[in-house]
Amino acid sequence: MGMQMKNFKKMMTLMALCLSVAITTSGYATTLPDIPEPLKNGTGAIDNNGVIYVGLGTAGTSWYKIDLKKQHKDWERIKSFPGGAREQSVSVFLNDKLYVFGGVGKKNSESPLQVYSDVYKYSPVKNTWQKVDTISPVGLTGHTGVKLNETMVLITGGVNEHIFDKYFIDIAAADESEKNKVIYNYFNKPAKDYFFNKIVFIYNAKENTWKNAGELPGAGTAGSSSVMENNFLMLINGELKPGLRTDVIYRAMWDNDKLTWLKNSQLPPSPGEQQQEGLAGAFSGYSHGVLLVGGGANFPGAKQNYTNGKFYSHEGINKKWRDEVYGLINGHWQYMGKMKQPLGYGVSVSYGDEVFLIGGENAKGKPVSSVTSFTMRDGNLLIK
């Protein structure tokens, strides 16, 4: 996608202490084959029968599935997505259908990148896609979503559609001598001026309706990770503006169709670092009651720059892909160890007590096709 995509990737781009923590690559975890093609900035979900579906992102319009209950597990290609290639969509299973919300892409080879507000659903029984007769209340890119029940999904966060789209329109229209000025003007603003979405939306697939469920207790974010367990929502880090992350983790309870926000927590600094920059594009999921968060990416030093008044906070800083894994154990966050390689912007899927990390972007910015997993077992973190 040329210069537009390069800029997009740039932008987007002590109770617990008594627990024995170890890293091992052997044990009980399930081994899955690599996905057929490298995947980053894609999306995925798992149905009630243990079948994982992943696609979009660098896979273009391709989608694949794998049945975790089969003895011989292989990826199978399903019908291609009809809505065009796109990145950063969110997908969940509702009423036995795979729903795909929003994303960012190009309508044709000549058009600039733009945010989508459309919704598609896939029938595994018929192997068919259908565009749903609805649009989201705001454009959805950099958003996150969690399934509430068989008919409802919670969606929040994401960039401001109009500001985001305008940036890529300006980049497309600028000649080479003007591009750096456009880029600087876009990044050199305080976080509040990006108007990231902080409204929480509930989509009801049965009624095909959208509902405003309130707002986040703090700033809107993009590129956050989210998980739902026993009616408790965890919204993990994300960008406050392009290049600047937050280390805050929002926590809420979903009860009687109402979201109640609880006390926030913060991810601890990585070993050897003075502060936690926060993560975008991290993997996350629960294993035996422990919330695990790993990978993602940030710009070390951007937070201090922003505190010092430098709005283009990541200017001149190399993006760093992370390999640290953190665990929330008995209400306390702790460092658990390292992944096999630094990785972010892949797909997290939980099944039983395993968290599968599918695809992602490595430290060279390249998509990978590997599938690894996190599992807590007898007080140990197994990475396979």
UniProtKB/Swiss-Prot annotation:
The keyword RNA-binding does not apply. It holds the Pfam family NANM. Residues 1-29 form the signal peptide. It is found in: Periplasm. InterPro entries: Kelch-typ_b-propeller, NANM, NanM_proteobact. The keyword Signal applies. HAMAP family: NanM. Belongs to the NanM family. NCBIfam families: muta_rot_YjhT, PRK14131.1. This is N-acetylneuraminate epimerase. It comes from Salmonella typhi. The gene is nanM.
